[in-house]
């Protein structure tokens, strides 16, 4: 009888490959905005540097439904949604990869902060940290880190 063996992908190698999936800046931002629309946001604001002296960072803020800590943690998991799962016709999401792959195709650090029922949650995928640790480690931010 065949023996089962778990074969976990090498974290920095796979994340590096996913970062190279060919997103343009515009399509990456559109993918993240689609998540805002799926969360019934009526307001989406895109923040980006306007001068060379500003830090190179893009922020996408919305007034969508938000996610609980548990739901946000799951949303930050690569492959968090089955391709066969039912979803709205106009929802671009299919495999639970878009937000992470789109965002990290343009940067080395993805932080998502969510507010749900007066509670804040935040997680960060940091490509450099994953390379250092050689593991799929996501960082949970403290309230103080969220405020900064």
Predicted feature residues:
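Bergerat-fold GHKL ATPase/HATPase_c domain
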Residues: 1-49, 70-74
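Residue-level signal for pocket-adjacent positions within structured domains
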Residues: 9, 13-16, 62, 90, ...
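General structural signal for secondary-structure boundaries
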Residues: 9-15, 68, 126-128, 142-145
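Amphipathic alpha-helical transducer elements in NTP-driven molecular machines
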Residues: 22, 26-30, 69, 92, ...
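Conserved beta-strand-loop-beta-strand hairpin that lines the nucleotide-binding pocket
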Residues: 36-87
């Amino acid at each position: 009888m065949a023996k089962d063996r778990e074969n976990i992908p090498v974290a920095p190698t796979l994340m590096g490959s996913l970062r190279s999936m060919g997103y343009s800046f515009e399509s990456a931002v559109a993918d993240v905005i689609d998540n805002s629309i799926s969360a019934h946001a009526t307001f989406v604001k895109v923040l980006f540097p306007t001068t060379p002296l500003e830090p190179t960072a893009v922020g996408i803020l919305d007034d969508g439904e938000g996610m609980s800590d548990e739901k946000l943690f799951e949303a930050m998991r690569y492959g968090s949604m089955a391709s066969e799962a039912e979803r709205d016709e106009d929802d671009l999401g299919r495999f639970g990869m878009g937000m992470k792959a789109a965002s990290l195709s343009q940067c080395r650090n993805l932080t998502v902060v969510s507010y749900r029922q007066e509670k804040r949650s935040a997680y960060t995928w940091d490509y450099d940290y994953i390379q250092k640790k050689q593991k799929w480690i996501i960082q949970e931010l403290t309230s103080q880190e969220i405020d900064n």
